[in-house]
Amino acid sequence: MASGVTITLAIAIFALEINAQAPEPTPREEPSADALLPIDCRMSTWSQWSQCDPCLKQRFRSRSIEVFGQFQGKSCADALGDRQHCEPTQECEEVQENCGNDFQCETGRCIKRKLLCNGDNDCGDFSDESDCESDPRLPCRDRVVEESELGRTAGYGINILGMDPLGTPFDNEFYNGLCDRVRDGNTLTYYRKPWNVAFLAYETKADKNFRTENYEEQFEMFKTIVRDRTTSFNANLALKFTITEAPIKKVGVDEVSPEKNSSKPKDSSVDFQFSYFKKENFQRLSSYLSQTKKMFLHVKGMIQLGRFVMRNRGVMLTTTFLDDVKALPVSYEKGEYFGFLETYGTHYSSSGSLGGLYELIYVLDKASMKEKGVELSDVKRCLGFNLDVSLYTPLQTALEGPSLTANVNHSDCLKTGDGKVVNISRDHIIDDVISFIRGGTRKQAVLLKEKLLRGAKTIDVNDFINWASSLDDAPALISQKLSPIYNLIPLTMKDAYAKKQNMEKAIEDYVNEFSARKCYPCQNGGTAILLDGQCMCSCTIKFKGIACEISKQR
């Protein structure tokens, strides 16, 4: 991790005003007592099979979700699209790839002949380096440059419903024969900027303080987390993490798993999307929606390592992405286009910032806190969130990168009063800790998860320091400007216009298909939330139960 000047991360604690307003009532009727029985997912019947696509030699059908599972009924986790091999009755009008005077790679990619035998993998399969009579003419010659993880991550996709895309459309290991170098002022290291990235800057910034918010109403807390993870295009309280549509099946190619049909970094120990255990953590968080006497302490700290802007024309896309676009049917088939969106995302990042977001939610037991005389400020002091955390790069160690320091005194977890000693970390004050970190290596994420599984409740500033030290190896998108994924379809590709129109429609249908409007309404002003095919009710502060049907005043 990097910083050329001292950046102080002093944890300034403040309490937010609690918003206890009830959500707007739904115009639909509330469920009767019978409706509180488990409601299973209900889908429409399959459509008729489409005509046989003459080029893909497949036909398709689809269905829709009518009602999502609710009140502990079966979730909607089955595919909405289906495909079947068929024998076409029409001829396929194939377009022959023609690179003209350029070199055609074995992958079909066209590159300039000046890129042959330069030591770079310009074709993506090294076929441009396979027939060289002399030593390669290296673009960077004898200059020392390293591959940039920020550059590799730039442009990564976003799913409008919060899912992690499986692959990236951009080949950010293509340099077009250039040796554009970017200097990291903290480590004095030079990195090579990929061709697809028009602008890349190493700029380390960090929040001056950890941002802390506390919520007494579960819905407000959950709503904040959900909206942080979906885009502004998605106004529904709906999240989807599980892939339901099969990857695109290419003609003459056996069906592959999502992992094999995606572009990953060379280091398999680093998760390319850098958000770990997301579904599991949201399920844990949702389990508190109908519980009472809980308080939620939300802690966030952000570190930016750099900024990027992608080229808006002439980008080099991965062969896999282009093949998957070609494998889309010209007619609109919902399941096929949904599968494409779940592979690459609904949008890509045209510009943004890279780094990491450290985010934890502490679930506190209000009754236990009141009984033992523990205040919210006591909990924060126990966790070390009243300390200064300094991120600095001493001059004498600039070449070794930055370091973080903090001193957490765990005696601060002991509170005395009325002749009693309360250990905040052990005496049932902190019920749970849920992590939503973005960025950092999988190793650090696993270490944090193992610590939580052992029952540790004091995930503190020291854990933040360990995580932050791994950001250089695995940065994540922390802010971005989005562009629709269909803008990347090359205009010269056969049927490009039709497929672009289909994909635009698919994004709209995708949001409408997985909408909380297909949930039964909750009672007493509760709000329906859709989480991975299952509807749940988030109750106002005076009610509880799976449908908010029980008054807390009874």
Swiss-Prot record:
MACPF domain sequence ranges: 136-518
Keywords on record: Complement alternate pathway, Complement pathway, Cytolysis, Disulfide bond, EGF-like domain, Glycoprotein, Immunity, Innate immunity, Membrane, Membrane attack complex, Secreted, Signal, Target cell membrane, Target membrane, Transmembrane, Transmembrane beta strand
Domain TSP type-1: 40-93
Location in the cell: Secreted; Target cell membrane
Activity control, per UniProt: Membrane attack complex (MAC) assembly is inhibited by CD59, thereby protecting self-cells from damage during complement activation. CD59 acts by preventing incorporation of the multiple copies of C9 required for complete formation of the osmolytic pore. MAC assembly is also inhibited by clusterin (CLU) chaperones that inhibit polymerization of C9.
Positions of disulphide bridges: C41-C76, C52-C86, C55-C92, C99-C110, C105-C123, C117-C132, C140-C179, C382-C413, C519-C535, C522-C537, C539-C548
Pfam families, sorted: Ldl_recept_a (PF00057), MACPF (PF01823)
EGF-like domain: residues covered: 519-549
Expression across tissues: Detected in blood serum (at protein level).
Site note Cleavage, residues: D267, S268
Residues in LDL-receptor class A domain copies: 97-134
Residue ranges of the TM segments: 233-240, 267-274, 376-383, 384-392
Glycan-bearing residues: N261, N409, N423
Post-translational modification: Phosphorylation sites are present in the extracellular medium.
Superkingdom: Eukaryota
Any single GO BP term: protein homooligomerization
Cited InterPro entries: Growth_fac_rcpt_cys_sf, LDL_receptor-like_sf, LDLR_class-A_CS, LDrepeatLR_classA_rpt, MAC_perforin, MACPF, MACPF_CS, TSP1_rpt
Membrane topology value: Multi-pass membrane protein
Signal peptide limits: 1-20
GO CC terms, sorted: extracellular space; membrane attack complex; other organism cell membrane; plasma membrane
Subunit-structure text: Homooligomer; about 20 C9 chains oligomerize to give rise to a huge beta-barrel that forms a 100 Angstrom diameter pore in target membranes. Component of the membrane attack complex (MAC), composed of complement C5b, C6, C7, C8A, C8B, C8G and multiple copies of the pore-forming subunit C9.
Chain's role: Pore-forming component of the membrane attack complex (MAC), a multiprotein complex activated by the complement cascade, which inserts into a target cell membrane and forms a pore, leading to target cell membrane rupture and cell lysis. The MAC is initiated by proteolytic cleavage of C5 into complement C5b in response to the classical, alternative, lectin and GZMK complement pathways. The complement pathways consist in a cascade of proteins that leads to phagocytosis and breakdown of pathogens and signaling that strengthens the adaptive immune system.
Family: Belongs to the complement C6/C7/C8/C9 family.
Name listed for the protein in its UniProt record: Complement component C9
Taxonomic path: Eukaryota, Metazoa, Chordata, Craniata, Vertebrata
